[in-house]
């Protein structure tokens, strides 16, 4: 446990940041889940709308370091591929 006042303050700040970052990570997962649900339901319009909403959030979290930039790129690429497959299957 932290003994000095500065260490106590840092521990408090770290806990505050950890919980905030956890909520941001959860938000990203929710946006991704919304896209996946729309894809599973084979609803192209809803999937595209959810993807359009998710991309800026994913990018913002990657810029902030909440998730790694490669993970953000991987999510966007895979979701985009699924939507493209859905659109070609629907056509």
From Swiss-Prot:
GO terms for cellular component: cytosol; small ribosomal subunit. SUPFAM superfamilies: Ribosomal protein S20. Residues 1-23 are annotated as: Disordered. Transmembrane segments: none annotated. Binds directly to 16S ribosomal RNA. GO terms for biological process: translation. This is Small ribosomal subunit protein bS20. Belongs to the bacterial ribosomal protein bS20 family. Residues 7-20 have a biased composition (Basic residues). It comes from Pseudomonas paraeruginosa (strain DSM 24068 / PA7) (Pseudomonas aeruginosa (strain PA7)). InterPro entries: Ribosomal_bS20, Ribosomal_bS20_sf. Keywords: Ribonucleoprotein, Ribosomal protein, RNA-binding, rRNA-binding. The lineage of its organism: Bacteria, Pseudomonadati, Pseudomonadota, Gammaproteobacteria, Pseudomonadales. GO terms for molecular function: small ribosomal subunit rRNA binding; structural constituent of ribosome.
């Amino acid at each position: 446990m932290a003994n000095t006042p500065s260490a106590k303050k840092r521990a408090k700040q770290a806990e505050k940041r950890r919980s905030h970052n956890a909520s941001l990570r959860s938000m990203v997962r929710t946006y991704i889940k919304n896209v996946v649900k729309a894809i599973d339901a084979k609803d192209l319009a809803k999937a595209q709308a959810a993807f359009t909403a998710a991309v800026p959030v994913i990018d913002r979290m990657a810029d902030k370091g909440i998730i790694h930039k490669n993970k953000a790129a991987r999510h966007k690429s895979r979701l985009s591929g699924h939507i493209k497959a859905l659109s070609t299957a629907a056509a």
